[in-house]
Regions:
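N-terminal acidic, proline/glycine-rich, low-complexity intrinsically disordered segments
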Residues: 1-33
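Active-site anion/phosphate-binding pocket segments in diverse small-molecule metabolic enzymes
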Residues: 2, 49, 54-86, 90, ...
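Positively charged, low-complexity intrinsically disordered regions
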Residues: 6-12, 21-23, 46, 53, ...
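Short N-terminal alpha-helical targeting/association segments
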Residues: 18, 25, 39-41, 192, ...
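Long, low-complexity intrinsically disordered regions
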Residues: 22-23, 27-53
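Active-site-proximal beta-alpha core segment in soluble small-molecule metabolic enzymes
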Residues: 60-68, 72-83, 93-250, 254-261, ...
Length: 432
């Protein structure tokens, strides 16, 4: 079987549980049942499927560098990720709970995060690109995988190779997907993404009725999910939230019988009308606060430490770092630490005489970061410490009370940016 000049090796679809719509009893006529990957019969309920589900895959560690060859280490607590997923799943019940693991699981490692979540009971994953879907498939052989960025021209065969599901956001993609399924007798599933207010990706709402009629006329339509995306879920009082929920409720009625998904991490903490059949948290899994409350309901996941290379005395009136932006107002003791913006530690976290910057933890005490963050190094004012420090001592940049949300504030960015920019010059450790 050929697609262009590339031979297509189509895997036999796996039997997996998938989100089920919660309005089946409301249907006055026969519902549109989402087909199984084989296209034969409606999917079974998750409880029945779980009874005969295969054992979870073994834990898969990611790639790392030797500790002796780098200046910093990054520890990811996979147990905390799994617990965060359980917390979110409980909050969203009876909706099913997926996991978004795009961007290398927000910088935490697709393979270890996916295998930990699969072991915790998660069986549906969302990624941005097909290359990420391949990694998820290797770590969770029985998972349902959706690819948010959809089908690039000529790439439909890639989805068939690993039994991944495209999230279709325009009619061109839908035409290509239908043609591929017809030519190759492929019965794999897909999602339809409708734009309800983000004005980014998604089919126009005006197309929903005609597409729903088309789906009703095709017994093996392959549409396993309809979805949209909230633009302002992190602002609970924003009027667009309720407008999007109302518009999506209308779409869901048109596609009665097909599971529906709207809520992201913050959307889970809106009222339950945003939950529908499947929620898809991302940033909250990795320890960021998905609410506007000061108390974070998520467990911290990431700890970032770097080694102290040198401690030195700086006379009063002397400056530190590029641009001479920070001036010692007294005789000061500073520590030079082996991490910088090349490692993803944001340059705006540095400070100047006019602006306070971020902090790090040394010997259990918070100390200010001073001067500019440079490519490989930063400086910390440790004058207030009462104990001696030594070359090779650890300094904590994330952890010991410093979370990704606080660091994002120092960097004048968002928590997503903090996590996904963390680089690969670390010795990485995955706790599980």
């Amino acid at each position: 079987m050929l697609f262009g000049r590339r031979k297509v090796r189509v895997q036999k679809p796996k039997s997996v549980a998938t989100a089920q719509p919660r309005d089946e009893a409301e249907s006055p006529t026969a519902a549109i049942e989402p087909p199984t990957p084989d296209g034969d019969a409606p999917a079974t309920r998750p409880e029945a499927e779980a009874e005969r589900a295969p054992p979870p895959p073994p834990f898969v560690a990611g790639e790392t560098l030797p500790a002796a060859e780098v200046g910093a280490d990054l520890t990811i607590d996979c147990t905390a990720v799994a617990q965060n997923w359980r917390t979110l799943a409980s909050r969203a019940a009876p909706a099913d709970c997926a996991a978004v693991v795009k961007a290398d699981a927000y910088g935490c490692g697709i393979e270890p995060i996916t295998s930990s979540l699969a072991a915790a009971g998660c069986n549906t994953f969302f990624v941005a690109h097909i290359a990420e879907a391949r990694r998820v498939r290797a770590a969770a052989p029985n998972a349902v995988i959706y690819v948010l960025n959809g089908i690039a021209p000529g790439s439909a065969h890639c989805f068939a190779e690993i039994d991944a599901r495209p999230v279709i956001g325009n009619l061109g993609e839908l035409t290509e997907w239908d043609a591929f399924r017809t030519v190759h007798s492929w019965h794999g599933g897909a999602a339809l993404h409708f734009d309800t207010g983000m004005n980014r990706l998604g089919l126009p709402i005006e197309e929903a009725a005609s597409l729903a009629g088309r789906v009703r006329s095709l017994p093996n339509h392959g549409i396993a999910l309809v979805m949209s995306h909230l633009a302002c879920a992190d602002e609970p009082r924003h009027p667009l939230n309720q407008k999007q929920i109302r518009d999506f409720q209308e779409i869901r009625i048109m596609f009665r019988g097909v599971p529906a998904s709207l809520a992201n991490s913050a959307g889970i903490f809106l009222d339950s009308s945003a939950h529908f059949d499947l929620v898809r948290p991302g940033i909250a899994l990795y320890g960021a606060n998905p609410t506007v409350a000061n108390v974070n309901p998520m467990r911290p996941v990431v700890e970032l430490r770097a080694r102290m290379l040198q401690a030195r005395i700086v006379p009063e009136g002397s400056t530190v770092g590029y641009g001479a932006t920070w001036t010692a107002k007294r005789v000061s003791r500073i520590a030079i630490v082996s991490i910088g913006y090349a490692d993803g530690y944001s340059r705006p976290i540095g400070s100047s005489d006019a602006r306070r910057g971020g902090e790090a933890v040394v010997q259990g005490r918070r100390c200010p970061i001073i001067g500019r963050v440079s490519m490989d190094l930063l400086a910390i004012d440790i004058t207030e410490l009462t104990k001696d420090v030594h070359r090779g001592d650890w300094v904590t940049l994330l952890g010991e009370g410093i979370g990704v949300d606080e660091m994002a504030g120092w960097a004048r960015t968002i928590n997503y940016d903090v996590l996904t920019r963390l680089g690969h010059r670390f010795h990485r450790v995955w706790k599980h």
